[in-house]
């Protein structure tokens, strides 16, 4: 979110060893550079996250998944530069939309899914993968045939069967075995063009301009919300700012606590009141990713909050215009102004990414394997918040 009109799409392309992932990615990059020259595109390999001196590159334990999650988060937040564990660094432009292709064995682990714009699994049967393995490692790289076959049988194939193949069900698109590469390229290329069209549409129609300082504080809230999402928590987070200083922050804990009242705003308020008098809220501004609910809006009013900035509306429980306008009621406590639409599209997509995934802690868990993440974001109706 370094630039409020810049969008990042992260495409995870997973599959087993020698399934054709890298070849697909390289040809997709060529097509992107010719068909969308104004879009920045880059390929990242999961092997960049191998622990030093790893012996078995096929084992999940050989990869620094936590470091990988941090890089995914930085890309999602619009970082200008990312550095990988292998020592390489990548500069990301802030004046172009970005499509980042990532290929690797373990991209579709449950904790990584929220970061991807699209998830693809390249499937090939064991015989085809073995044939490619021999051709590449023996013929091209002059490897020892006996060792190559032993590695495939004792390391590569067991890892695929037990840990890689099961993640296939998390993919949005599965490219079937023996499929002609040109057909796969055409299909995935069109898919990327659709994603680009949505990125361009939302970036041009859903921008609400605010001062850079307000954007800085909201970015802090979004960083916490993205972390919450990766931990399967409702991605609503906030920061309270008093005279230019962040004095409190919070994120929803409704899932982990199984309590419907552990909202970001209330958690942050509790922490603030441990160190400051209640009178501090008269000069404090709240930045929250989603419109405060009825309960939180009322609490903010009782504390005489100075102002509230939020990203997207809360169509079911909003207390600042979407359902009720508690912030405007002057019958008991003073009213407070609200400023919606700060990183609106990003806030909408965070919530969609949460609700499209399985939530085993929901009161009535529902299977969501067939749900598709919608990318079109309608323009925000600002009139209801005036």
UniProtKB/Swiss-Prot annotation:
It is an enzyme of class 3 (hydrolase). Its cofactor is Zn(2+). Coiled coil: none annotated. GO terms for biological process: nucleobase-containing compound metabolic process; tRNA wobble adenosine to inosine editing. GO terms for molecular function: ATP binding; deaminase activity; kinase activity; tRNA-specific adenosine-34 deaminase activity; zinc ion binding. The active site is at residue 265. It holds the Pfam family dCMP_cyt_deam_1. The keyword tRNA processing applies. It catalyses: adenosine(34) in tRNA + H2O + H(+) = inosine(34) in tRNA + NH4(+). CDD domains: nucleoside_deaminase. InterPro entries: APOBEC/CMP_deaminase_Zn-bd (IPR016192), CMP_dCMP_dom (IPR002125), Cytidine_deaminase-like (IPR016193), P-loop_NTPase (IPR027417), PRK/URK (IPR006083). GO terms for cellular component: cytoplasm; nucleus; tRNA-specific adenosine-34 deaminase complex. Keywords: Hydrolase, Metal-binding, tRNA processing, Zinc. Its EC number is 3.5.4.33. Residues 212-322 form the CMP/dCMP-type deaminase domain. Heterodimer with Tad3. Belongs to the cytidine and deoxycytidylate deaminase family. ADAT2 subfamily. This is tRNA-specific adenosine deaminase subunit tad2. It comes from Schizosaccharomyces pombe (strain 972 / ATCC 24843) (Fission yeast).
